[in-house]
Amino acid sequence: MEVPFTIPGDQVNAILYKKTKDKYLSRLSKVTMPSNNRIDALCMHFGSCGGCCWQQLPYELQLKQKEKSIQNLFKPYLNENVKWHSIIPSSPWHYRNKMELTFSSDKAGRRYLGLIMQGTRGHVFQMKECLLANGWFAQAARAIQKWWDNSDVQAYHAIKDRGSLRTLTLREGLRTGDRLVMLTVSGNPDYALTKSQLQSFVQVLRDSIELSNSDQKLSVFLRIQQIAKGRPTNFYEMLLYGPDHIREKLYLPDFNEAIQTLNFRISPSAFFQPNTEQAEKLYSQALKLADLSASHVVYDLYCGTGTLGICSAKYVKEVIGIELSRESVLDARENVKENGLSNVTIKSGDVGQVLEALSQENSLKPDVVMVDPPRIGLDAKAIKHILDLKAPKLVYISCNPKTQVMNLGPLIDGGYQLQIVQPVDQFPQTVHVENITLLTLP
């Protein structure tokens, strides 16, 4: 049974509302006797927000629970030949560099800009604070709420295809102080925002978002989400103010304990790890497990903005990154230039198709394959291509260990052996955990 907002040792009253294949889903009604480990949550929205569910659990116990969950998942593969590394902790608060808020209104006309309520399908509550992100996120949200309240612009209603405002995306470069705001609106031309409305939107942000020095930049985007029955959803982005990207730096400890500084540009919709400090630990650990050398050729699959491959470029002969998202590919190529790297090539396209093309081109075979796929994990076609590469080392980073462990079966059947499991906590106060595995061919 799953009961959100509880911890081991709590005695509670819960309301069952759904049975799935392997568990009951329920809502917490009352904690009749709290666990001795229970603490008070810090956030005023805890219990209604769908973002956090573990603020009532001390952080050291959160880490133990996450380690336990990974151990349970990987139990069929853990033996005396597999090294288990303790979970790498994170700063528990104010770690997120990106948030997406939703516009909504109720039948009475009340307007809400915030996060989705826990256990609901799209019900939004008014966000006044979020302790997982920098304080300016909530400050900007309050300013936009005021702008919206003083306008006749409507929140988008998906069923009726009416209204304009869908989401508000907030991003920052932790190391640079750059800030980005993107307003996503519907593609229904009957509800298009006017030029004056967009100008006032930008001005509100310029007035409310404080930049501490002239090197810090603010970027404001409009994104139009075009939906039509029987057709794929299309997005069109328009720069309203500032640079067309934000900048970020990663500080990675070198193998000789010096610090390697790497520069990255991030477009509004491109993927970048949402916890910057923890991304540095994640990538450093991945490079350490790969045990790279100057003769190595590295394939970085699902490379996003090229981060992992760029981090490894200094230590190897050649890096080939593969990414499907065109926007991420453009960023990745710019990031390669930004860091002055001549041994990194970014290929655009489906991983399986690009790998097939590389094999036909007789490109250099990889010594190390690194994969960081989306939550759905590797599909059967991608696994087949990875097995065909026969790389001696495979470093698999996952934001969803459940699909990662599902992928282990066919990889091990294909000849790989699991060597190391390394959990990394990217998202304190939540159940989510990142995981790195090292697999090798005998």
UniProtKB/Swiss-Prot annotation:
Residues bound to [4Fe-4S] cluster: C43, C49, C52, C130
InterPro entries in alphabetical order: MeTrfase_TrmA_AS, MeTrfase_TrmA_CS, NA-bd_OB-fold, SAM-dependent_MTases_sf, U5_MeTrfase_fam
GO biological process, one term: rRNA base methylation
GO molecular function terms listed in the Swiss-Prot or TrEMBL record: 4 iron, 4 sulfur cluster binding; metal ion binding; rRNA (uridine-C5-)-methyltransferase activity
Enzyme class (EC, first level): transferase
Cross-referenced SUPFAM superfamilies: S-adenosyl-L-methionine-dependent methyltransferases
EC number(s) per entry: 2.1.1.-
Keywords, in A-Z order: 4Fe-4S, Iron, Iron-sulfur, Metal-binding, Methyltransferase, S-adenosyl-L-methionine, Transferase
Residues of the active site: C399 (nucleophile)
Domain of life of the native organism: Bacteria
PROSITE patterns assigned to the protein according to its UniProt record, in alphabetical order: SAM_MT_RNA_M5U (PS51687), TRMA_1 (PS01230), TRMA_2 (PS01231)
Binding site residues for S-adenosyl-L-methionine: Q273, Y302, E323, D372
Family stated for the protein in its record: Belongs to the class I-like SAM-binding methyltransferase superfamily. RNA M5U methyltransferase family.
NCBIfam families: rumA (TIGR00479)
Entry-linked PANTHER family: RNA M5U METHYLTRANSFERASE, TRNA (URACIL(54)-C(5))-METHYLTRANSFERASE
Stated name of the protein: Uncharacterized RNA methyltransferase pc1544
Species per Swiss-Prot/TrEMBL record: Protochlamydia amoebophila (strain UWE25)
